[in-house]
């Protein structure tokens, strides 16, 4: 594997670890709320609206707006600044991790997860999966679907491309749920401050991104173009096989 691509796969797996860590931390520490996504929160808005629990509804609407603001910023920032959005995203993750450990246990669970509602969608929209795959680092449903279909197609057709695809999605799922498992263990032993161990993979991600930038700068343009073309051809192959 080309060194540049190796770093990008490692970045993806590291971010999946962080996504799983923050995801389960939110669930076990804040009333079973999953801060990485909005589905449950939006259903809560509907429930509170019909049940006329307007105070809780407003808190959930606040979480929705924060989530949307993060998505908007990932579009707006590249149009106005030349900074690497990946560093900004990891910086937001680090700040969110620091904040979460200081929030008291008695505060509103929704408000306590506002940093997660901002950091996770920012990460989701910033980092694209390597190798042309379609994979999120903050939740698992699509990753599980892709892994299952790839394994099924490999068993039926013995296609090596599907084997590679299954390995990628399998590693993504493993990274995500390893982070989730460690998050639970640290929460059980350290309480709310257990979130701070997630700073280790976050700073490791910073190092990986720096290494990826340096490698990309040292790689001749022709080599990068060839690698990109190879990825595009593989994507086309997947589309034909999955059509």
Predicted segment positions?
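Alpha-helical transmembrane segments of multi-pass membrane proteins
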Residues: 1-243
């Amino acid at each position: 594997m080309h060194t540049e691509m190796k770093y990008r796969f490692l970045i993806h797996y590291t971010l999946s670890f962080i996504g799983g860590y923050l995801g389960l931390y939110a669930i076990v520490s804040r009333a079973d709320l999953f801060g990485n996504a909005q589905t449950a929160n939006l259903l809560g808005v509907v429930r509170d609206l019909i049940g006329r629990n307007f105070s809780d509804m407003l808190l959930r609407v606040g979480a929705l707006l924060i989530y949307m603001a993060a998505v908007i910023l990932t579009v707006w920032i590249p149009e106005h600044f030349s900074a690497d959005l990946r560093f900004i995203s990891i910086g937001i993750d680090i700040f969110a991790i620091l904040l979460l450990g200081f929030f008291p246990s008695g505060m509103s669970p929704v408000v306590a997860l506002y940093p997660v509602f901002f950091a996770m969608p920012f990460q989701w929209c910033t980092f694209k999966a390597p190798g042309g795959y379609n994979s999120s680092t903050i939740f698992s449903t699509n990753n599980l679907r892709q892994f299952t279909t790839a394994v099924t197609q490999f068993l039926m057709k013995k296609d090596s491309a599907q084997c590679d695809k299954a390995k990628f999605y399998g590693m993504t799922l493993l990274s995500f749920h390893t982070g989730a498992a460690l998050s639970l263990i640290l929460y059980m032993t350290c309480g709310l401050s257990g979130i701070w161990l997630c700073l280790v993979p976050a700073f490791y991600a910073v190092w990986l991104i720096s290494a990826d930038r340096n490698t990309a700068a040292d790689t001749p343009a022709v080599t990068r173009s060839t690698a990109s073309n190879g990825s595009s051809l593989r994507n086309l192959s997947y589309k034909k096989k999955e059509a």
